[in-house]
């Protein structure tokens, strides 16, 4: 305001300046494509006509114009925002850049294999240091995998337990089948507890090894009682066994929720006092009433819970073990959203590269990083260090490294 306006309002020298009031409006700056043009000196002899050229700057991929920023944009588009490559092709064309989906697919395969795989392998080795991990799997179609059309392949996911909020690791692995050989190989150097659903292959691994414990998922058990309750007439639901069991599981979860901010030792102690008696009572009820069960849905729910009892009780023996595998299901959700959009992967190499890139993307998100900026940083730094015999530089690229540029981290909510 002008001095005249202030004098009119307050009188001569009748005011003092306070801190400014601030208003904000947000502007959006659209993406744009720029060309980095490098000029290389070319020289010819005046006597015999032979030519020499200066050194070209090293490219990210030999014979390709792709840069770290462009590759990061493709990765962010497909593997974070679930945009199929044909739509990215159309989007880039609107910005004046003509690149085919086949070119982009080839870039993803080569970048995954040549650069990002080294960080993936490093994260894999670090996952072994966690006392509790989680595992899950989801089907995926691969068009050219040497089998008949419609044959299911699988994307397996392994992640650090969600009781460890810092230094999260989420790793995908593509395999053609769902048999036990795949987690057996992936977890061959792991000792600890793995939280899973009730899929038998995990129990097979536990029987083979003394250093691996499988913990069960209470959400999968609860889901079967939900399904059993759904077939009971509404007016009789509150009198049904399904309802009583679900109320007991709800009580267990409510008490568990109150322990989330405790240390592992305190959580275990409180579980023994407040939750174990409820679990004991629940399984006693299931065993007592198993022979009285009527509907097929309820029989299935009773059978599942009783068969899984050993695994469902593991969380009562270790404060780091969660009650369910929800964290691994959340970790695989990004892949499932993308799968609905692009429906199938073209080749086995594409599936393997997708597993690597999804792993980096989901691990970045879990550690509060901005995936695009993280991809660009990795694709700038890793190529420069690939000839290093010492791989310690990978520690500086981990999502929790303090040496990462600050711009890669998501800002705290205002």
Predicted regions and their residues:
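Helix N-cap / beta->alpha transition motif
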Residues: 1-2, 217
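Catalytic center-proximal scaffold of phosphoryl-transfer enzymes
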Residues: 41-44, 49-414
């Amino acid at each position: 305001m002008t001095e005249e306006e202030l004098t009119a309002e307050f009188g001569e020298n009748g005011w003092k300046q306070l801190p400014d009031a601030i208003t904000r409006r947000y502007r959006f700056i659209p993406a744009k494509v720029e060309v980095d043009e490098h000029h290389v000196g070319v020289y010819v002899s005046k006597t015999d006509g032979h030519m020499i050229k200066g050194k070209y700057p090293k490219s990210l991929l030999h014979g390709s114009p792709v840069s770290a920023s462009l590759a990061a944009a493709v990765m962010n588009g497909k593997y974070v925002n679930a945009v199929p490559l044909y739509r990215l092709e159309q989007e880039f064309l609107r910005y004046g850049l003509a690149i085919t989906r086949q070119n982009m697919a080839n870039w993803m395969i080569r970048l995954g294999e040549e650069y990002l795989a080294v960080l993936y392998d490093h994260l894999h080795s670090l996952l072994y240091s966690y006392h509790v991990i989680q595992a899950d799997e989801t089907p995926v179609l691969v068009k050219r995998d040497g089998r008949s059309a419609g044959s299911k392949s699988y994307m397996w996911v392994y992640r650090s337990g969600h009781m460890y909020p810092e230094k999260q690791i989420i790793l995908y692995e593509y395999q053609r089948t769902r048999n036990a050989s795949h987690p057996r190989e992936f977890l061959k150097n792991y000792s600890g507890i793995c939280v899973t659903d009730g899929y038998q292959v995990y129990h097979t691994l536990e029987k083979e090894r003394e250093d691996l414990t499988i913990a069960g998922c209470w959400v999968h058990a609860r889901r079967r009682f939900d399904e059993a309750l759904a077939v009971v007439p509404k007016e009789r639901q509150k009198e049904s066994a399904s309802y009583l069991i679900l109320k007991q599981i709800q009580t267990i979860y409510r008490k568990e929720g109150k322990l989330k901010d405790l240390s592992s030792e305190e959580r275990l102690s409180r579980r023994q006092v407040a939750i174990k008696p409820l679990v004991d009572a629940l399984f006693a009820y299931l065993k007592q009433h198993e022979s009285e069960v009527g509907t097929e849905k309820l029989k299935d729910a009773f059978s599942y819970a009783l068969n899984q009892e050993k695994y469902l009780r593991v969380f009562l023996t270790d404060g780091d073990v969660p009650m369910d595998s929800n964290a691994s299901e959340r970790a695989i959700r990004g892949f499932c959203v993308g799968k609905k959009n692009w429906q199938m992967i073209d080749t086995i190499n594409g599936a393997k590269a997708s597993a690597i890139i999804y792993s980096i993307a989901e691990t970045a998100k879990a550690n509060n990083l901005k995936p695009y900026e993280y991809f660009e940083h990795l694709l700038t730094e890793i190529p420069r260090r690939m000839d290093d015999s010492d791989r310690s530089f990978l520690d500086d690229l981990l999502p929790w490294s303090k040496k990462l540029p600050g711009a890669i981290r998501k800002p705290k909510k205002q």
